[in-house]
Amino acid sequence: MNKDAQMKAAINQKLIETGERERLKELLRAKLIECGWRDQLKAHCKDVINEKGVEHVTVDDLVAEITPKGRALVPDSVKKELLQRIRAFLAQHASL
């Protein structure tokens, strides 16, 4: 395992141990609902299903279709807030 992978694993482990990972996930979930991201993605899913026909769409097809759009629709403000929280966490746990 290279240095980057080791560092990533150590950070992830610390996030899990402290419960910060769950808090970050909950914050992300709330922010995405608040900004309408979830509703936009749900509407896009319905459009894809209606376009292709419910019998011709698998879950894997739907995931492949909506993942890029879902990532692109995340507002910059949400990304920045999460990044700020992660940086603050790393600053507190600089011994990693």
UniProtKB/Swiss-Prot annotation:
Entry GO MF terms: transcription coactivator activity
GO terms classed as biological process: chromatin organization; mRNA export from nucleus; positive regulation of DNA-templated transcription; protein transport; transcription elongation by RNA polymerase II
Keyword Magnesium set for record: no
Pfam family, any one: EnY2
Keywords, sorted A to Z: Activator, Chromatin regulator, mRNA transport, Nucleus, Protein transport, Transcription, Transcription regulation, Translocation, Transport
Subcellular localization: Nucleus, Nucleoplasm
Keyword field contains Transport: yes
A GO cellular component annotation in the UniProt record: DUBm complex
Entries under Gene3D superfamilies matching the protein: 1.10.246.140
Entry similarity comment: Belongs to the ENY2 family.
Oligomeric form and interacting partners: Component of the nuclear pore complex (NPC)-associated TREX-2 complex (transcription and export complex 2). Component of the SAGA transcription coactivator-HAT complex. Within the SAGA complex, participates in a subcomplex of SAGA called the DUB module (deubiquitination module).
Protein role: Involved in mRNA export coupled transcription activation by association with both the TREX-2 and the SAGA complexes. The transcription regulatory histone acetylation (HAT) complex SAGA is a multiprotein complex that activates transcription by remodeling chromatin and mediating histone acetylation and deubiquitination. Within the SAGA complex, participates in a subcomplex that specifically deubiquitinates histones. The SAGA complex is recruited to specific gene promoters by activators, where it is required for transcription.
Protein name per UniProt: Transcription and mRNA export factor ENY2
